[in-house]
């Protein structure tokens, strides 16, 4: 319960800081998710636009009898720099380096999630063996690990909320969120 309260307080703090850092004004370039699709509106030619494509990786682990033991799905953004008001080589290189650092962070994060799948797979196989697969005969029963993303962006910041759902055979799945903010000029 203390961890949940601490996470909630962190999310509120990130939200307040984001509002303060953006000066509580309408940004020149706003990006939001609309119907699970990123929408970008640029209202000033002086703002470089960083566009985002989504990549999703899915994993499935099955028993020899084709019973699905574990499914995993991880969604991460892949940022690309699509415009630049300043064509100097140094500024363009700095922005590109920032975008690369952000992309590397998300790739590393996803790889850490995938690394934990080995442990989940071992747990699922052990339970399957112990129970004779009885629980897996229930419709849609399988261990599950998923992470999706919602985000907000202006000309200076990219704020991301990672939403996790993990199920390992208990009464209900575990859910939690992690908020991360990136400075678009430094990554």
Model-predicted segments: where are they?
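C-terminal motif of bacterial Sec signal peptides marking the signal peptidase cleavage site
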Residues: 19-23
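Short, surface-exposed coil-to-beta transition loops
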Residues: 144-146, 164, 173-178
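Sec-dependent N-terminal signal peptides
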Residues: 7-13
């Amino acid at each position: 319960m203390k961890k949940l309260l601490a996470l909630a307080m962190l999310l509120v703090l990130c939200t307040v800081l984001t509002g303060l850092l953006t000066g509580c004004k309408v940004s020149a370039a706003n990006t939001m998710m609309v119907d699970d699709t990123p929408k970008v509106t640029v209202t000033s030619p002086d703002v470089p636009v960083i566009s985002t494509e989504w990549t999703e990786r899915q994993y499935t682990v099955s028993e020899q009898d084709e019973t699905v033991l574990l499914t995993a799905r991880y969604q991460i953004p892949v940022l690309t720099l699509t415009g630049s008001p300043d064509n100097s080589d140094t500024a363009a290189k700095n922005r590109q380096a920032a975008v690369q650092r952000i992309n590397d962070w998300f790739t590393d994060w996803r790889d850490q999630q995938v690394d934990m799948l080995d442990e989940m797979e071992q747990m699922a196989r052990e339970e399957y063996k112990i129970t004779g697969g009885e629980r897996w005969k229930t419709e849609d029963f399988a261990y599950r690990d998923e992470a999706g993303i919602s985000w907000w962006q202006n000309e200076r910041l990219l704020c991301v909320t990672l939403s996790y759902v993990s199920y390992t055979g208990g009464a209900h799945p575990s859910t939690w969120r992690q908020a991360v903010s990136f400075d678009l000029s430094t990554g």
